[in-house]
UniProtKB/Swiss-Prot annotation:
<comment type="function">
    <text>Catalyzes the acyloin condensation reaction between C atoms 2 and 3 of pyruvate and glyceraldehyde 3-phosphate to yield 1-deoxy-D-xylulose-5-phosphate (DXP).</text>
</comment>
<dbReference type="GO" id="GO:0008661">
    <property type="term" value="F:1-deoxy-D-xylulose-5-phosphate synthase activity"/>
</dbReference>
<dbReference type="InterPro" id="IPR029061">
    <property type="entry name" value="THDP-binding"/>
</dbReference>
<dbReference type="GO" id="GO:0000287">
    <property type="term" value="F:magnesium ion binding"/>
</dbReference>
<keyword id="KW-0784">Thiamine biosynthesis</keyword>
<dbReference type="InterPro" id="IPR033248">
    <property type="entry name" value="Transketolase_C"/>
</dbReference>
<keyword id="KW-0808">Transferase</keyword>
<dbReference type="GO" id="GO:0030976">
    <property type="term" value="F:thiamine pyrophosphate binding"/>
</dbReference>
<dbReference type="GO" id="GO:0009228">
    <property type="term" value="P:thiamine biosynthetic process"/>
</dbReference>
<feature type="binding site">
    <location>
        <position position="146"/>
    </location>
    <ligand>
        <name>Mg(2+)</name>
    </ligand>
</feature>
<dbReference type="GO" id="GO:0016114">
    <property type="term" value="P:terpenoid biosynthetic process"/>
</dbReference>
<dbReference type="Pfam" id="PF13292">
    <property type="entry name" value="DXP_synthase_N"/>
</dbReference>
<feature type="binding site">
    <location>
        <position position="365"/>
    </location>
    <ligand>
        <name>thiamine diphosphate</name>
    </ligand>
</feature>
<dbReference type="Pfam" id="PF02779">
    <property type="entry name" value="Transket_pyr"/>
</dbReference>
<comment type="pathway">
    <text>Metabolic intermediate biosynthesis; 1-deoxy-D-xylulose 5-phosphate biosynthesis; 1-deoxy-D-xylulose 5-phosphate from D-glyceraldehyde 3-phosphate and pyruvate: step 1/1.</text>
</comment>
<feature type="binding site">
    <location>
        <begin position="147"/>
        <end position="148"/>
    </location>
    <ligand>
        <name>thiamine diphosphate</name>
    </ligand>
</feature>
<dbReference type="InterPro" id="IPR005475">
    <property type="entry name" value="Transketolase-like_Pyr-bd"/>
</dbReference>
């Protein structure tokens, strides 16, 4: 590493660097990021792709005054390094360390927290309007990827920004990827724009030539009357300018000179500007350039060997994908939907085997849910695979388009519960609370991977709205047998016991088993453990029996306490006049920060030791 990055103590110092030094700084950042993220894990390829752009932004703007919002935020690592967080980068995504996304409480340079996609344009427009109303003239910049631009919220914002003529700069970071390959009409449009780069160069070259003589200037003035028509022919649609944005492109996102030129022009233009840059995910690390999807998010890895795929252990996502293929082979009405996450949700092989029955709608969860509702209305059996945290974006569609009509749409909620290192914006700890109040909604959870297969088979013949929630990763080493069949609304006694009954949901049954074993070893007392396969409806018959037999009851869930499973059980037990103690173990009313799940469970009293301590207090 050269001395350029080492000597930067204030981001304002970057303004004083010449072009050669800026290029060296970019290489220093690449070298530092490759070394650091290979040790900590994190978002890898996307960050390598925006380093040159980040350097150019610091050259042209003062972020002690100007504002920048990184859409999604996973590509903000170089920005974090240059804003005083380099020495803490070895704590990235660790509990108590740096967050992997922008976070207002982490730095004065993080102006708006992000994590979910397609929010940057709306927040940037809000900041720009606030600047105007407050009499300020600071620049506002939003950096958004071509994948995030497929999100409906981003398109809504573009429409409003073009109409209101907000004074902001939008940088379209076009790497032709979100996590996986982009899909949809906008992706096709952007590809046509890339192909039309010759038009932009031709226009520039001809203009420069004509400007050299007075006759040429008159010719240029006459030809300008044909400009709009020529654009329509050579560059398809000119969508951005049609809705009121000044378009600059296409710019090489790895050419600092080009970036400086266009940014220096854009910052002096009033009204909305969009700069279309083309970048390469993984730039500077050959293996990531060749396979950016594999290197999107990585665990720690050896730089010489690269990321090694893990095939040894089963996980819920891959099992879901395998079972979906089995269902589709036996039932031609089964279809799969995802919102730009075919790999993460385990549907990659399904897509290859059943391309006509697989629908990747892009980053469009609202559309995905109502698309599924339409399919269900016509007799298909749609399964929408989505991370729990992203289903939050489609609350109204689930309620209005699925539940009111009681349509048989199956919501497969991957990453339910703690996801760990991605932190507050990605923890899947709210789905029980926002789905439970919906009439006609049923919620189930497998206690182990093998039970996932049983539930999915049952779900394919369930004729009403259904949510299946399951965690990231695999099982703990606990010996659990799956249910042989599903009986609607009924729970399962996993282990017999006296005095205390644990009623746990999903993977928390495994935590309960370990805690109960500790109690057996220390106190020689057997704890009754119940697998609440159905989170909604609750098994009132079994609860009546527990109450009649005088059990103290502990509910355990990896969801927030408010509106959760435990509160539903507590409400019913109070209704029937249960006399014994009731304890609900869940996450309290707070957001759960980033860190390894084991640490986060422990801190929140939901690991086996914490559960054991709760049980001891009840004995």
């Amino acid at each position: 590493m050269s001395e350029v990055l080492q000597r930067i103590t204030d981001p304002k110092e970057i303004k004083d660097l010449d072009e050669k030094e800026l290029e060296i700084l970019a290489e220093d950042l690449r070298e530092f990021l490759i070394e650091s993220v290979s040790n900590t894990g994190g978002h890898f390829a996307s960050n390598l792709g925006v380093i040159d752009l980040t350097v150019a932004l610091f050259k042209n703007f003062d972020f002690s005054e100007d504002r920048i919002i990184w859409d999604v935020g996973h590509q903000s690592y170089a920005y974090k390094i240059l804003t005083g967080r380099k020495d803490k980068f070895n704590t990235l995504r660790q509990y108590g360390g740096l967050c992997g996304f922008p976070k207002r409480t982490e730095s004065e340079y993080d102006f708006f927290a992000t994590g979910h996609s397609s929010t940057s344009l709306s927040s940037a427009a809000g900041m720009a309007r606030a600047q105007r109303l407050l009499g300020k003239d600071n620049k506002v910049i939003a950096v958004i990827g071509d994948g995030a631009l497929t999100g409906g919220m981003a398109l809504e914002a573009l429409n409003d920004i073009g109409y209101r003529k907000d004074n902001l700069i939008i940088i379209l970071n076009d790497n032709q990827m979100s996590i996986c390959k982009n899909v949809g009409g906008l992706a096709t449009y952007l590809n046509k724009l890339r192909m039309g780069v010759g038009y932009n160069k031709l226009k520039s070259d001809i203009g420069s030539t004509l400007d050299t003589t007075s006759f040429g200037k008159r010719v240029k003035n006459s030809l300008s009357k044909l400009k709009d028509g020529i654009k329509k022919i050579v560059v398809p649609s000119m969508y951005f300018e049609d809705i009121g944005l000044k378009y600059f492109g296409i710019v090489d996102g790895h050419n600092i000179r080009e970036l400086n030129e266009v940014l220096s022009i854009a910052k002096n233009i009033k009204g909305p500007v969009i700069i279309h840059t083309v970048t390469k995910k993984g730039k500077g690390y050959e293996l990531a350039e060749k396979n950016p999807n594999k290197y999107h998010g990585v665990s720690p890895f050896d730089l010489g060997e690269g990321v090694i795929s893990k095939f040894a252990s089963r996980n819920y996502s891959s099992t879901f994908g395998e079972e979906m293929i089995k269902l589709a082979k036996n039932d031609d009405k089964v279809v799969a939907i995802t919102a730009a996450m075919p790999d993460g949700t385990g549907l990659k092989e399904f897509r290859e085997e059943f391309p006509d029955r697989f629908f990747d709608v892009g980053i469009a969860e609202q559309h995905a849910v109502t698309l599924a509702a339409g399919m269900a209305a016509e007799g298909l059996k749609p399964f929408f695979a989505v991370y729990s945290t992203f289903l939050q974006r489609a609350y109204d569609q689930v309620l209005h388009d699925v539940c009111i009509q009681k349509l048989p749409v199956t919501l497969c909620l991957d990453r339910a519960g703690l996801v760990g290192e991605d932190g507050e914006t990605h923890q899947g700890i709210f789905d029980i609370s926002f789905l439970s109040p919906m009439p006609n909604m049923t919620i189930v959870a497998p206690k182990c991977i093998d039970e996932m297969e049983v539930i999915l088979k049952w779900a394919s013949n369930f004729n009403a709205p259904l949510a299946i929630r399951y965690p990231r990763g695999g099982d703990i080493d606990v010996n659990l047998k799956p249910l042989s069949k599903i009986e609607y609304g009924k729970w399962e006694k996993v282990q017999e016991g006296d005095k205390i009954a644990i009623v746990a949901t999903g993977k928390m049954v495994q935590h309960a088993m370990i805690a109960a074993q500790k109690i057996k070893e220390e106190k020689n007392i057997d704890i009754l453990i119940i697998n609440a396969t159905f989170i909604k409806p609750i098994d009132k018959e079994l609860l009546n029996s527990l109450s009649k037999d005088g059990f103290k009851i502990v509910t355990i869930e990896d969801n927030i306490k408010k509106g959760g499973f435990g509160e539903g059980v507590l409400e019913y037990l109070n209704e029937i006049g249960h006399k014994e103690k009731i304890v609900t173990l869940a996450f309290n009313d707070k957001f759960i920060e980033h860190g390894k799940p084991d640490i986060l469970y422990k801190i929140n009293g939901l690991d086996a030791e914490g559960i054991k301590n709760t049980l001891i207090e009840l004995l």
